[in-house]
Structure formats: C-alpha cells, structure tokens
Design a protein with these regions (language model features):
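Alpha-helical interface subdomain recognition
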Residues: 1-84, 187-328
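FAD-binding core of flavoproteins
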Residues: 85-94, 98-208, 212
Length: 328
C-alpha cells in the first residue's frame, strides 16, 4: 500500500488542524474541564461548526448532501480531533449520518448529537446520555434506535475522563430497528478504525508534549532530553505512534477497498496498535514530565484518561487480540 497522502488529503488534514486548534485550543479545553457548569457538556455551537466542516458528513454521498469521501479521509480528520481532545460522541454521530431519513440528515448537519452503544455488553455504560438526541444500539439483529429520554440509569460520579460523562444502565427500551446486521457489522469496523485514529492523534500529541518538555526542562545543569533514559522514552513513543499510524491508515484504505487486504485483520490491528500507542505514550509522557506529570495543571493526564476511555470502545485489548489470533 502507498500511504503517501495526496495533495487533497494534505490540504484536508491541514485545514482540519487549523480549525481544531483555532476553535478548541488549550484555553478552551481547560475551561471546559476546569470551569464548565456541567463537566463534559457538549457545546452545541461547536457541534454545529464541526458539522459545517464536514466532520459528520465526510462519507455521505455528495448527491445526499455529504462530502463524498472515504474512510481514509475520515481517519485523517479524526486523528486531528484526537490531537486536541475534541469532546463528544464524534464517531457515533459520524456513523449515524449515513442513515437514511431525518436522523441521518440531523446527524450530518449537527442538529442531532447521537450516541452509540454495543447492546451485547452489560451493564451498559452510555456516554453523554444527558446530551443525546438519539441513542443507537448495536445488537445481533442490527441497529436499534432508542429514545435517550426513556433510558433510566445512574450517572457515574467520577468518570475516568472528565470530558466524558458516563451513565450506567441495566436495561434499555426495545426501540426501533433502523438498520440490518450487515450495517451493524460495518459500523463496528468503521467505528474501530476512527477510534483508532483518535488514539493515533492522542499518541502523536503526547509524543510532541514529551519531547518539547525534554528540550526545555533542565536538571543537573543540562536539559533532560540529553539523558539517555529520557531519549529512549521519547524514541519509543515515536516508534509506537508511527506503527499505529501505519496500522490505522492501512485499515482505512482496506475498508475503502477490501481487495487490498483482509478488512477484519486490518481493523483489529489498527484498534490494537492505536490503543497501545495512546495508553503507553500517556504513561511514558507522564514519566518524562516527572513530578509535574502527575499534576492537574499539566495536560498529560487528560490525554491518558481519554486514551483509556477509547481503549474500551469497539473492543478492548484482550477481546481484539483474541479475535485477531482467531484469524491466523
């Protein structure tokens, strides 16, 4: 496979990075977690802006009002979202935008905030429940649409990621079947790749943060980046990030053109390597920052916590590794 980005893809990534850094910079990110009246709340104005840039309609056909691109381009966009810790059910709303009818239109345009949960794993942990306009449930029968206002649950008092409020739910209304089993399976694959792309963005940003700190922090009369142990940590972070990048890009290309490889193997590998890079880089970045890395004021812990949350979505490490082993 050729992973060299086309000029259009480079322009897309550059434009999305400029938008993300301009509309959700560090000051806004910290304000959301430090001073927001409701921690982890979905900013509806920002959600609409994301929709206007094509975050949710990227893969919707042009004749249906979308951008008409593929999973490869979506992965580039979601990698950038991961770099700045954009909050909210981004992947779920992106997937919902492909549905026919009003829900798909509302998701694509940013009118609706849509959640997604795998109905085979109990008890359910539903993210952003209070902010949702619709909840989609992946089941053995396909995809069911549930009214989130009819869902009863217990909010988790201190969620791992302060940007991601979670509600524990023991049962769900039956809802309405809106898509078949094949669509549900395809959503699982695309969702895993886009979540892997978010993890790739997190891993890359953590590498940048650690190396920048290592260049600036002085100890014993020299910058700590000159010490071999710190060099090795930063180098290992970069290697993990680039391995994850290759895996995520390969999976995205494979979903766009299954003839180039085995989609199941590619998707599982992308999610495994993305999760591994993000979570391990979070731990190594904390170590590079020393005692400062454990403080609330340094952003490393926010990236690590988000990585832990993503690592539970679309299959955890053990589940995905067993599934990958079964294909060999």
């Amino acid at each position: 496979m050729d992973f060299q980005l086309s000029e259009d893809q480079r322009d897309l990534r550059s434009g999305v990075r400029e938008f993300c850094e301009g509309r959700f910079d560090r000051d806004r990110m910290r304000a959301l977690v430090d001073t927001a009246p409701v921690p982890g709340m979905v900013d509806r104005a920002l959600w609409k802006e994301l929709a206007e840039t094509g975050f949710f309609s990227l893969r919707v056909a042009e004749e249906d009002g979308g951008v008409g691109l593929g999973v490869a381009e979506a992965a580039l966009v979601y990698e950038e979202a991961g770099r700045v810790l954009l909050p909210g059910p981004l992947v779920a709303t992106h997937l919902a935008a492909s549905l026919p009818g009003d829900l798909g239109t509302d998701a694509a345009s940013g009118v609706a905030v849509v959640g997604l949960v795998d109905g085979d794993v109990w008890p359910l942990l539903i993210e952003h429940l209070d902010a949702l306009d619709a909840l989609l449930v992946l089941t053995d029968e396909g995809i069911r649409l549930v009214d989130p206002s009819a869902v009863q649950g217990v909010p988790v008092g201190h969620p791992v990621d302060p940007f991601t409020p979670v509600t524990a739910v023991d049962e769900l209304p039956a809802g309405e079947l809106v898509a078949d089993v094949a669509t549900a399976e395809q959503w699982r694959r695309i969702g895993a790749v886009l979540t892997g792309a978010l993890q790739l963005g997190i891993a890359g940003r953590l590498t940048e943060m650690a190396t920048q700190y290592a260049k600036e922090r002085e100890q014993f009369g020299r910058v700590i980046g000159g010490f071999q142990a710190v060099k090795h940590l930063c180098a290992e972070m970069l290697v993990r990030t680039e391995i994850a990048r290759a895996a995520v890009y390969a999976a995205a290309v494979t979903l766009d053109d299954p003839a180039v490889g085995d989609p199941e193997v590619a998707v599982l590998t992308a999610k495994i390597m993305g999760d591994d890079a993000a979570t391990k880089n979070g731990k190594d970045a904390t170590q590079v920052h020393g005692g400062m890395g454990f403080t609330w004021e340094v952003d490393v812990h926010l990236y690590l916590k988000r990585a832990w949350v993503h690592a539970t979505q679309f299959g955890g490490a053990e589940e995905n590794e067993e599934a990958l082993a079964a294909t060999l």
